[in-house]
């Protein structure tokens, strides 16, 4: 969540900086533009606790097999971006993303089709920005990072939105944001689980989006069509050491709801207490969602989620935290658009959606260490333990993102990341998560992710 806030502020800073050193001609704007890139080699090994199917079948339960099984996948990728220098406050930017999985077998294609498998390239960003004073407008295809509208970058292809975003910092210590989006680009063409695994390709922009928090409600996926979405947000830092954030998201005419609309709410406070040898961190968040007609109401996603977290940082290289979240009875919570919205209790790999269902209580303990303090610059480790209890609904009818029996899930997660000082731009990371889900039966699952990224 803090990254989301920082990214919004970074957009403003970048816009103001570009106008300060603007080009004099269109030719200069392109000549003085900046090229950025990243080369990637990733290896994922995932075991969902289900056997590999004989045939890849689209859709959800009981027949659908996409996203199930036990397989590994090696992928290579490239990101290439370009942004012009500012000319009278205007600049243009574009970002291509490419992915290739040369050794994927049929089991890997079935398992990773919704999120990782698909070869080719996509123009994920193509935008114009305009800065006037302390106001920046950005229109076109773009990556967005905010609490309720968030492009997940945890897979090879980062999600993107076709949108218009307006950011203003005229008020002291305050950032105001407004935005509109009408299309979304997922991780693969099969992010909605609509085709067999071997047919998954690169994604395109569509009038549908991931509605994180709905589980597998629409044909086995959390993807729904919509007719435009609007958002407004504010960040205030007027009180020393305290950051307050609020955001509202309105989604018009959501698919399968007979024209129903979604209203999603977010409020957060982050307080830092500087001490002599460390910092004490106190965080609290509210998430909520409301629906607009009888059809949408029958899905029971008018829930409230309350979260709290207390932690320490910069204690001789150590950081640690304890977090708790709870969701209201028989009503789940929509977390937002895209797979990027998160919660304090989200497991490292599994993500936040398992914490936002109706009747859910979750706890997470996290400990990290920065080896820079002992002379190993760039090396960091992280460990997490997460426990999630979700009870079955006490009402009849559909409750999205619910369970059919009382469920207890535990996650042990770890990460090692190394920014190699001798090879600037090269980062290696290894993540692993072991999970156990217990209801009427016990399912054990695990996932390993290795990433090598070189930025230039």
Region spans (language model):
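Outer-membrane beta-barrel pore domains
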Residues: 49-69, 111-115, 245-456
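Short, surface-exposed connector motifs at secondary-structure boundaries
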Residues: 240-244
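Structural detector of coil-to-beta-strand junctions
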Residues: 125, 231, 264-268
